[in-house]
Each structure stands twice: as structure tokens, then as C-alpha cells.
């Protein structure tokens, strides 16, 4: 997502998975220097105050660093071309898998001695068409996909380092004076956090912030502070989704244009304080099926 200039809201019901991911991304090393990866960890007043200190630190770290623009443009163009080829290859592969499944289904139906008219349609129409499409796509080898992956770690880290610097340096633009005024304010942490939360509650300000920090990490409950309840991020990634109740999960979900749920169906369900008797009465009143039982399910298991 970062290399394709997409914005991401990384959310979870609990702090632990969020902190683990943020910590790893903030500790990427390039030739003895920490990559100033543009991710912002938001949350309660304490987390928000820490985020403001992070913004100030990254700004001071990056503002004087030279950025090899031409090199970045070349690397970006190369990676974009490879990503496009890889996407096309994966789409072909998915299509081949679909065709193979259709072929197997047709062959099973033929073995079942279907009615004559239906059998003729399968043998003379559908099966030859599927075979023609499979022949046209040809064989797709794993090596074809591996060849398109970026295997040069040094070059990748260099690109990541200078691209991150490029993002952070945008804070020097005049449009960010109001944000930097909050960051540099002499107010106490609680007052600064309140001012920042008011700032990002405005959709236009959130949009500006995402030009500098395209990756935002926060808990589901704290995501309500991010602009209006409408899609502001290209993608929402929800970790430990099997422990997120449906209602709380909707807070980050409705802020993204696409969604990735990461979870384990064997994990315990979320802790929900709704009385079982009330839940049963509400299910009966609104004809809620078992699959959508609020107590028994999570956003991952629905």
C-alpha cells in the first residue's frame, strides 16, 4: 500500500497488536539510520501526545536531509511497472484456477450421466470453451511471479528511507503551519492532544495529514476521531478481527474504501456485556438469524 501511495488505517480492538506492528515499522534500519517511516500511532490522550512528539522528532530529523529525487522517480517507476505486471500475472492465475474448477465440475457432471440435452450442452459447448481458454492462458509458473518481486534488499531499504524522508518534509509546506503550531505548542500534553483531535476531526485536515502520514494506527474505539464517518482511507486493515465485536468494528470499517480482516476463527469471541435474555428478545423482535447473533459472533465470524 505504501509503495503504491495508498492510505491505510490499521486498527484493532486491543492495543497490543497495534503497538507490535508500529514498533517494527519504526525500527527499520538503513545503514545505521532508522527509517523515518510515516506511520502515526493515535489513540487516547497519552498516545496522541506521544504521536505529536514523534511528528516533531521526525520533522527535525528529516528537514535538512537531501533527497535524490531522480533516483526515487526511477525506482518508483521500476517498482510500479513490476507491481502492474505482478498484478496482471496474479489475475491470470486466479482466472486459470477458476477455469480448472469449472472443468472439474463439468467432468463430474458428465460422469454422473446427466440428461441427454444437458450432457450435449456440456460436451459440445461448455467443456470445449473452458479448454480453449485454459490453452490461451497457458501455464503459469511460480518462477514467473518470483522474478517480479523485489529481491534487492539494499535498494528497497534505500527507496523506503528516502521516500519516507520525502513524506515527512512535506510538513514544511505552508499548508501545515496550523498542524505544526499544535506540535510546537507549549501547552501541556492533554491540551495539545485535545487540539490535535479537534484538528483531525475536520475531513480536510485529515486529508492533509494523510499526505504526510499515509499509515495511521489506532484502536477501533479511537477511530471515531478521524474525520467524518465516511471513507477517508484507501484501505482498513483490522488485526485480531475475531475479537472485535460487530458494532465497534464498524467505526474504522466505514472509514475505508476497502477492507482486510486478519484473524483466527479459533480465537475466543469478543467480550460482550449484553444480557443473553435481551439479546434473545432483540433477535426475535428483529428476526436476526443465528449467523448474525451479536453475542456469538465477531466481525470476522459473521
Q: Where on the chain are the PLM-derived regions?
A:
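Conserved helicase motor core of SF1/SF2 NTP-dependent helicases
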Residues: 221-238, 242-302
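P-loop NTPase Walker
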Residues: 1-98, 105-108
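Conserved helicase NTPase catalytic core signature
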Residues: 110-233
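Feature representing long, continuous alpha-helical segments
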Residues: 16-19, 23, 211, 215, ...
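Generic, well-ordered alpha-helical scaffold segments in large soluble proteins
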Residues: 1-4, 20-24, 28, 216, ...
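Beta-sheet entry/capping signal
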Residues: 7-9, 38-39, 214-216, 234-235, ...
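A general structural signal for short secondary-structure junctions and capping/turn motifs
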Residues: 31-33, 206-210, 250-253
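Short, glycine/acidic-rich beta->alpha junctions
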Residues: 2, 13, 17, 198, ...
Amino acid at each position: 500500500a505504501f509503495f503504491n501511495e495508498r492510505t491505510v488505517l490499521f486498527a484493532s480492538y486491543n492495543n497490543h497488536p497495534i503497538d507490535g506492528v508500529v514498533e517494527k515499522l519504526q525500527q527499520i534500519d538503513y545503514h545505521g539510520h532508522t527509517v523515518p517511516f510515516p506511520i502515526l500511532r493515535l489513540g487516547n490522550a497519552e498516545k496522541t501526545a506521544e504521536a505529536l512528539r514523534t511528528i516533531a522528532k521526525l520533522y527535525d530529523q528529516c528537514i535538512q536531509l537531501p533527497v535524490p529525487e531522480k533516483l526515487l522517480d526511477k525506482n518508483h517507476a521500476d517498482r510500479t511497472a513490476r507491481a502492474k505486471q505482478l498484478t496482471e500475472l496474479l489475475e491470470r492465475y486466479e482466472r486459470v484456477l477458476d477455469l480448472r474448477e469449472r472443468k472439474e465440475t463439468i467432468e463430474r457432471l458428465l460422469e454422473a450421466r446427466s440428461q441427454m440435452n444437458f450432457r450435449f450442452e456440456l460436451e459440445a459447448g461448455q467443456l470445449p470453451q473452458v479448454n480453449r481458454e485454459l490453452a490461451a492462458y497457458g501455464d503459469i509458473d511460480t518462477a514467473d511471479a518470483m522474478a517480479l518481486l523485489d529481491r534487492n534488499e539494499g535498494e528497497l531499504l534505500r527507496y523506503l528511507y528516502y521516500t519516507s524522508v520525502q513524506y515527512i518534509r512535506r510538513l514544511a509546506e505552508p499548508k501545515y503551519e496550523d498542524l505544526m503550531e499544535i506540535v510546537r505548542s507549549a501547552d501541556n500534553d492533554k491540551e495539545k492532544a485535545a487540539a490535535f483531535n479537534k484538528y483531525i476531526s475536520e475531513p480536510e485536515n485529515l486529508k492533509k495529514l494523510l499526505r504526510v502520514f499515509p499509515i495511521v494506527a489506532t484502536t477501533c474505539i479511537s477511530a471515531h476521531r478521524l474525520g467524518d464517518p465516511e471513507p477517508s482511507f484507501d484501505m482498513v486493515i483490522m488485526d485480531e478481527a475475531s475479537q472485535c465485536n460487530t458494532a465497534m468494528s464498524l467505526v474504522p470499517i466505514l472509514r475505508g474504501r476497502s477492507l482486510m480482516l486478519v484473524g483466527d476463527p479459533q480465537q475466543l469471541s469478543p467480550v460482550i456485556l449484553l444480557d443473553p435474555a435481551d439479546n434473545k428478545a432483540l433477535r426475535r423482535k428483529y428476526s436476526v438469524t443465528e449467523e448474525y447473533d451479536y453475542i456469538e459472533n465477531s466481525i470476522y465470524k459473521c
